[in-house]
Regions:
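Short peripheral tails and domain-boundary helices/loops at the edges of structured domains
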Residues: 761-793
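A short beta-strand element within the Helicase C-terminal
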Residues: 457-473, 496-498, 746
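Short, well-ordered loop/turn sites that connect or cap secondary structure elements
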Residues: 491, 736-740, 745
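Charged, low-complexity interaction segments
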Residues: 1-414, 419-425, 438-440, 444-445, ...
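Conserved two-lobed SF2 helicase motor
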Residues: 443-459
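Conserved segment of the helicase C-terminal RecA-like domain
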Residues: 487-529
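Short alpha-helix capping/helix-loop boundary micro-motifs
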Residues: 726-738
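Short, Lys/Arg- and Gly-enriched loop/turn segments at beta-strand edges
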Residues: 751-764
Length: 1017
């Protein structure tokens, strides 16, 4: 079933009779055809086993270059406050990924370097299990402030903390023996710096009397032949963690976890929900067909790679007892006798398993951790010389008691980090590599030498002396480059600016080929669309709210009457204040003055919405829109209250199982936490539910840096408030994919998996066991992709192009997604070069705004020699729907959406999902419904349609060439302009452009109205 098949692949990715020769491996990746590493069923995701063809090590390159820069800075005569590196990236999650990658990389270097240094310090050049952790700890040169939750502790508390640290080190050292668990960082054994031997194994293989008791093949073999076979068997068991050691015992691991939680701090302690891998058992038989054992079992049968070696005559050269027919029965007899001798000598231990099977583990006391005998670089083959040299250098640093690596720490600095934590990091970063000090009896924290930030650090943050800036990618525009590079080298000081250009990034390579365009490029003045109706309207709402003279407070609970739970209306005093006479007249007067300032921008061509009565309608309707702006908050509040009630009913149900009670308690606690966040009354504007920030997010007030109507993800808090309970916000079009089912979110050193949608149902009565979610339906035109909703679904022809709707895509289970909830998955490791992304099939559809019952759109054409080449349609304030159709690799392409348990909101097990898309925690839902998530918003759009149908590859090239040209001409960031194929990626008949940034820059308006603009593009 999983046998690799030879194929030939064309450049398009299609299987052909000609092309590049390759091997196709059905199902998930189970073993490597080159090095032989194998994976059992416990490792499901291929993302943890393989790196993509497009992966080029951006994160590793950034980490190594940053460490190198700091190493150089330490050798200079600069002050400690200048010995630091500020790193930039364009994405918040990339900043979190890079900080986590850096910290994990440093910890791995310290752990492996300390092991190597400890072995070198021994006269016998080897370590054994009884002294392993203590010797490694000695050479780590850690101080209590590095690892202890209470570094001031003395006596028995300090001793217990050290014991816990040794136990955690023991687990990490043994787990590091597992082959294939690290993709980018080969361990010491893989780079031939470490050899694991088995004490006295040669003497065991020379015991003729013992071997004569077994199969004649073993009795007549030479000691060298026995040694080669036995050593290979033990190596395979060891690399699969078939080791009997207290550090891999699941019961002891729980004790370590509990003690670590109380006594250690990260990164040396275990994180509270870190998945610990326990020992496995080796069974020398094939896996039974119906094997459902919960134990980790490694099968080394006669069909395995080891079995093939045992059956190979070359392994027994000159042996007269090599059987003519080496069948399974013969193999079983041979390996059973090998294991019998090894058990006699104490190398392995037998354990009875289910179904009468015997499992074997290596006794850790026989392991000898040694240096390799020698290394010839010319014959190194696939050995990574870089890592070999790196580990060797780190070991030398530790042997010299150098604590350079101990000082290195990276943190993220983005808008999604709490304000007080961000301020603390800025203060620490200003100190650079300054050590921790005791000032007047108080501990003054050490400096922070590395800060990876999003563009929030471009302006307005005091970071004191800075000489080195690192950019993880080429900035979008010369203006961004000038701002970021300008953070270094103040007051005429020299500075170093490093920019990483990814080989697979067209944007990076474009400027790598011509760096002058970026480094010395002209900085154009920023553009903004002052004729954007939503932009002007939100400012007029702010004027109206100011004229009411009412302070709203910092929490929405100060605005709504929570005593009236059914409707949650505005509080009576606020309702009376905004309806006060005189407010409307004052707001109208100020509004007229504002519009007069925009007179030149609000012409008929660019602002058709601006009618003589428009201002009056906005001001008159402001009280109603103010009330409606709290609809989403009310919906969220009711959803959390309903979730708490449902969970409480289960907790009070005597017939509920213990499992149901635990799950209900977890859901109750989560909903309670979310409700507290909704009611948050902290004065900081960092809360997404601060009244004014919330109104800005709803589009009622100007948002500036805050996304309008964002998609939100709940992030549960962690130990010691490293991460507080919070909501992360994303612009909705971006959030639909970033916060999709089972997607991974990177935040504060950890990954979080989206496990649940917060069902903001308007009718709370529908949140029951027979719930049916409020779904919508749509039909898309097969020719132009235009969306038909409501009564338009019954039309026979498209209202946009007139084509028949028959044969178009019909979606009957659309659900507007607004909030999701996550669970912590794991710590960010240095294995991750790029963020893990789930493969969704996303489509975009649109509907023009209506004006006098007709679509509001302007048409234009470009011709050459009297022949029309391109047709343009510009639609101001068109409604765009972004739809997540489901997994890109789903089995049934006509089945849309994802399965969800409507009681809990959890994304449930989906038969359509690829094998690696869901982890082991995904379960069958009890009341399951299939929904297709979507979001919508209004944007100015420009549709470009070639008059003559073009091949698919030409349309793809045209789309990206035009997008890149528009960005270059108008100096837009890549994320500011979106381009989508219509009707979909497989049938490209037209290209849809819309400005993805809030407010927009008015670029599409200029393209539609300026004859020369498109020619310049």
């Amino acid at each position: 079933r999983y046998r690799p098949l030879p194929v030939r692949v064309a450049p398009s990715g299609q299987i052909t009779s000609e092309g590049l020769a390759a091997w196709f491996i059905p199902g998930s990746f189970r073993f490597c055809l080159n090095c032989g590493v194998a994976y059992d069923g416990s490792v499901r995701s291929d993302l943890t086993k393989l790196s993509g063809l497009s992966s080029e090590g951006r994160s590793s390159a950034t980490t190594v270059l940053t460490i190198s820069a700091l190493k150089y800075l330490i050798g200079t005569d600069l002050g400690d406050q200048a010995k630091k590196v500020l790193g930039f990236t364009d994405n918040r999650q990339d900043a979190s990924l890079q900080a986590g990658h850096f910290n994990d990389f440093v910890q791995i270097l310290l752990l492996r370097g300390a092991l190597l240094a400890a072995i070198r310090s021994q006269s016998a050049r080897q370590l054994t299990d009884d002294v392993l952790t203590q010797k490694v700890l000695d050479h780590l040169h850690l101080e209590p402030t590095d690892y202890a939750a209470n570094p001031e502790a003395k006596g028995i508390k300090a001793q217990n903390t050290l014991k816990t640290l040794r136990d955690v080190l023991g687990y990490r050292l043994y787990f590091d023996l597992q082959r294939g668990w690290r993709i980018t960082n080969p361990n010491l054994e893989q780079v031939r710096l470490l050899a694991i031997d088995y004490q006295g194994l040669k003497e065991c293989c020379e015991d003729e009397a013992e071997w004569q008791k077994g199969h004649p093949l073993l009795g007549s073999a030479t000691p060298q032949q026995r040694y080669a076979i036995v050593h290979d068997l033990l190596d395979r068991m060891r690399k699969a963690l078939c080791i009997k050691t207290i550090y891999l015992d699941p019961n002891f691991q729980e004790q370590i976890r509990n003690r670590s939680f109380n006594e250690l701090r990260e990164p040396w302690g275990l994180s509270e929900d870190e998945r610990l891998f326990s020992h496995a058992y080796m069974v020398p038989r094939a896996r039974p067909t119906a094997d459902r054992s919960e134990e980790r079992i490694v099968h080394i049968s006669w069909r395995s790679m080891f079995g093939r070696r045992v059956r190979a005559q070359a392994s027994w050269t000159g042996n007269p007892h090599f059987p003519r027919k080496f069948d399974e029965e013969t193999y079983n007899a041979v390996i059973d006798d090998i294991l019998r001798v090894l058990a006699t000598y104490g190398y392995v231990e037998r354990t009875g398993l289910d179904c009468g099977r015997l499992g074997y583990r290596i006794d850790s006391s026989v392991l000898a951790w040694k240096l390799t005998d020698g290394f010839n670089e010319e014959g190194a083959g696939s050995i990574n010389i870089f890592y070999r040299t790196l580990y060797d250098n780190v070991a030398k640093l530790l042997q010299a008691s150098d604590r350079f690596l101990h000082q290195l720490e990276a943190r993220e600095h983005t808008a999604q980090v709490d304000t007080d934590i961000r301020v603390d990091r800025e203060a620490r970063f200003r100190k650079g590599l300054a050590p921790q000090r005791i000032v007047e009896g108080a501990v003054e924290p050490a400096g922070l030498p590395v800060l990876f930030c999003s563009p929030t650090m471009e302006l307005g943050v005091d970071i004191s002396t800075l000489n080195t800036v690192y950019m993880r990618n080429v900035p979008p525009t010369p203006a961004n480059y000038a701002q970021r590079s300008g953070r270094a080298g103040r007051s005429g000081q020299p500075a170093l600016v490093i920019t990483y250009c990814a080989a697979k990034s067209p944007h990076d390579q474009y400027f790598f080929a011509d760096p002058t365009r970026m480094v010395a490029g002209a900085v154009n003045p920023p553009t903004i669309d002052l004729a954007n109706e939503d932009l002007v309207k939100s400012h007029l709402h702010a004027v109206w709210l100011a004229e009411t003279g009412k302070e709203l407070g910092s929490s929405v609970r100060d605005v709504l009457d929570l005593e009236k739970a059914d409707s949650l209306p505005l509080r009576e005093d606020i309702a009376a204040e905004i309806a006060r006479s005189g407010v409307r007249a004052a707001a109208m007067a100020r509004g007229e003055r504002i519009l007069a300032m925009l007179k030149t921008d609000l012409d008929a061509a660019r602002a058709a919405w601006h009618t003589p009565t428009w201002l009056e309608n906005v001001i008159t309707g402001a009280p109603l829109r103010f009330d409606e702006a709290f609809r989403r908050w009310r919906s969220l509040y009711r959803a959390t209250a309903s979730q708490m009630k449902l969970a409480n009913d289960i907790l009070n149900n005597a017939a509920a199982t213990e499992q149901d009670r635990r799950e209900a308690k977890a859901r109750y606690d989560e909903a309670y936490t979310q409700q507290n966040l909704l009611l948050d009354a902290r004065p900081t504007m960092n809360s997404d539910f601060h009244t004014y920030r919330y109104l800005a997010a709803e589009g009622f007030l100007p948002g500036y840096n805050f996304p309008r109507l964002p998609l939100m993800a709940f992030i549960p808090g962690r130990k010691e408030k490293v991460v507080r309970d919070s909501f992360l916000s994303r612009p909705r079009f971006l959030g639909l994919s970033e916060f999709g089912p089972q997607s991974i979110i990177y935040h504060e050193g950890s990954t979080y998996r989206v496990k649940r949608a917060i069902l903001t149902i308007r009718d709370e009565g529908s949140v029951t066991a027979s719930a049916k979610l409020p779904l919508q339906s749509a039909r898309l035109c097969p020719a132009c992709g235009y969306g038909h909703f409501g009564n338009q679904r019954e039309f026979e022809r498209c209202v946009n192009c007139g084509h028949k709707l028959e044969g178009g895509r019909g979606i009957s289970n659309l659900y507007r997604i607004e909030q999701v909830s996550t669970r912590r998955a794991m710590r960010i490791t240095s294995d991750e070069e790029e963020r893990q992304r789930q493969g969704y099939e996303m489509i975009t559809t649109l509907r023009f705004a209506a004006e006098n019952g007709k679509p509001r759109a302007e048409a234009a054409a470009f011709a050459d020699g009297g022949q029309t080449l391109l047709e343009l349609r510009y639609g101001p304030a068109a409604t765009i729907w972004r739809i997540n159709l489901g997994w890109r690799r789903r089995q049934d392409k006509s089945s849309y959406g994802f399965t969800i348990d409507v009681n809990t909101g959890e994304w449930s097990k989906d038969l359509q999902a690829p094998t690696d898309a869901e982890d082991d925690t995904v379960r069958e839902g009890k009341t399951v419904e299939r929904i297709t998530p979507f979001v919508e918003d209004t944007r100015n759009v420009l549709i470009l349609s070639p008059r003559t149908a073009l091949p698919r590859d030409v349309m793809v090239t045209l789309q990206y060439a035009l997008k890149r040209g528009i960005e270059h001409e108008f100096q837009l960031e890549e994320a500011e302009l979106a381009a989508e194929p219509l009707p979909d990626a497989d049938n490209r008949c037209a290209i849809l452009f819309y400005e993805a940034a809030e407010g927009g820059a008015g670029v599409l308006t200029r393209l539609a109205s300026d004859v020369d603009a498109l020619q310049r593009v």
